A protein has these predicted regions:
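Conserved N-terminal catalytic core of the sugar/cofactor nucleotidyltransferase
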Residues: 34-97
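Conserved core of the sugar-phosphate nucleotidyltransferase
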Residues: 109-195, 228
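Short aromatic/hydrophobic "clamp" motif used to bind/position activated sugar donors
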Residues: 99-101
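Hydrophobic helical membrane-anchoring modules
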Residues: 203-228
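Residue-level signal for inorganic ion chemistry
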Residues: 9, 33, 88, 103-104, ...
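N-terminal glycine-rich phosphate-binding loop and ensuing alpha1 helix
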Residues: 2-58
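Short beta-strand-to-turn element immediately C-terminal to the catalytic PLP-Schiff-base lysine
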Residues: 27, 139-142, 206-207
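Catalytic beta-strand/loop signature of glycosyltransferases that borders the donor
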Residues: 195-202
């Protein structure tokens, strides 16, 4: 069954760790943002997209998003992530969809099939997120970097995006818990337990210059199309 979900693409970050604008950085012939938008444009379960960006770049991003027919609105972001997502939800509130997916624009390797999997899991479980099991050994350290405790990685997942939930659940969770790093944190704090959608696709966030180089290699190899 095809869903009629909405997506909020968050592109309002500062790119401080990159040292340059990662959202509009060139990646395999397109920008990072365009690759993220394309996955949601191609997903049959997504009927509309709201793009959230820095206020001073509104016109630039409106022009870039014009090539994507599902982008219905480009709106300014807030001072923190939750405020940016709430701005997107406010746009959608005039005619709220049953489900909303939130995605970091800086994850340009996302595939339409993974978006669909997360949305269908959210429909079944109220909320869901793309996730991968933690595979590295984990140790807790002190302020000076001295390692003091081993942390079991059993049942630990690294959260990614998209993260999806019903409109009302997400709206209420973010309003009640604005100081969070992602939507899953707000939902859990509100007593909702999202489903982890475990996958093996490359879906890392562009954080450092090396990430962009790796994404370029994978995009040129057409990794997602061969993996789905």
């Amino acid at each position: 069954m095809t869903l009629q979900a909405a997506a909020i693409i968050v592109a309002a970050g500062s790119s401080a760790r990159m040292g340059f604008d990662k959202i509009c950085a060139s990646l395999a012939g397109r920008t990072v943002l365009e690759w993220s938008l394309q996955a949601f444009q191609d997903c049959a379960d997504v009927s509309e997209i709201v793009l959230v960006c820095a206020a001073e770049r509104l016109t630039e991003f409106q022009n870039l998003a014009a090539a994507f027919s599902k982008v219905r609105n480009v709106t300014p972001g807030g001072a923190q992530r939750s405020a940016s997502v709430l701005n997107g939800l406010t746009i959608l509130s005039a005619n709220p969809p049953a489900l909303v997916a939130v995605h970091d624009a800086a994850r340009p390797l996302i595939s339409a099939s993974l978006v669909s999997r997360v949305l269908h899991a959210a429909k079944t479980h109220q909320a869901a997120s793309a996730a991968q099991p933690v595979t590295d050994s984990l140790h807790r350290g002190e302020a000076d970097g001295v390692l003091s405790e081993t942390v079991s990685r059993q049942n630990l997942f690294a959260m990614q995006t998209p993260q999806a939930a019903s409109f009302d659940l997400l709206w209420n969770a973010l309003r009640a818990h604005p100081d969070v790093t992602d939507e899953v944190s707000a939902l859990i704090a509100s007593g909702i337990h999202p489903q982890a959608v475990v996958h093996n696709e490359p879906n890392f966030k562009i954080t450092y210059p090396l990430d962009l180089q790796l994404a370029e290699i994978l995009r040129n190899a057409d990794y997602n199309n061969s993996a789905i």
